[in-house]
A protein has these predicted regions:
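Short, internal strand/loop/helix patches
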Residues: 105-141, 146-147
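N-terminal "domain-start" segment that seeds a small globular fold
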Residues: 18-44
Length: 194
């Protein structure tokens, strides 16, 4: 019994890696991700002069649906500030159904995504980041160091009632070469389906 428990703990800890900490270098920068346009690219290729924003997302999570109307404005803010933006679908267990590549293409078109939406086969990138939720955001500066991780803002239900724009504030700080004041927040969302 103890042997089974030990093996189970080892297996589970291998699946759920520890989340990367502030100041960490971008993991998996050279993993290839398939974008909905059919091209395969790496995080290094998505990164721009002032950094990269990575959002772990999906097609059906109610939390993603609540926040996704903010994705395009965030993408625009990133573009304005010379920060790359990529959304990553790591729901491996659902890649043959509601989070299939074809469904991703449909979802992106239906929501007028203006940014890369990529497939993380086998959830390799999510595991490297220690990401566990959708949406789960990670902002890296121009030298590839993590400066913010967590939630988009403080109100998933109503964009008009947002009081704290954690991600937008972090993007603005990074683009000005300033320190991010709020470095971590709790990512609220559905679990990534490894």
């Amino acid at each position: 019994m103890i042997r089974i428990l030990t093996v189970s703990i080892i297996l589970i800890s291998g699946i759920f890696a520890e989340e990367i900490s502030i100041g960490s270098k971008m993991p998996g920068a050279d993993y290839f991700l398939k974008n909905i346009d059919g091209k395969e690219s790496t995080l290094s290729e998505f990164k721009k002069e002032n950094g990269l924003l990575v959002i772990f997302s999906c097609n059906t999570c109610p939390w993603v649906i609540r926040w996704q109307d903010r994705y395009n404005p965030i993408s625009d803010l990133c573009q304005k500030n010379d920060i790359g933006f990529v959304s990553v679908n790591s729901n491996t267990r659902l890649h043959n159904s509601v989070d299939s590549f074809d469904e991703m293409i449909y979802h992106a078109a239906a929501n007028d995504y203006k940014f890369p939406y990529t497939l993380d086969k086998n959830a390799k990138l999510a595991k490297a980041f220690g990401a566990t939720k959708t949406p789960h955001v990670y902002l890296f500066n121009g030298v590839g160091e993590l400066v913010y991780r967590g939630a988009i803002d403080d109100n998933a239900k109503n964009a008009k009632k947002v009081k704290r724009r954690y991600l937008a504030d972090a993007i603005n700080a990074v683009s000005r070469g300033m320190k991010v004041k709020t470095k971590t927040t709790k990512a609220l969302g559905c679990s990534i389906k490894f």
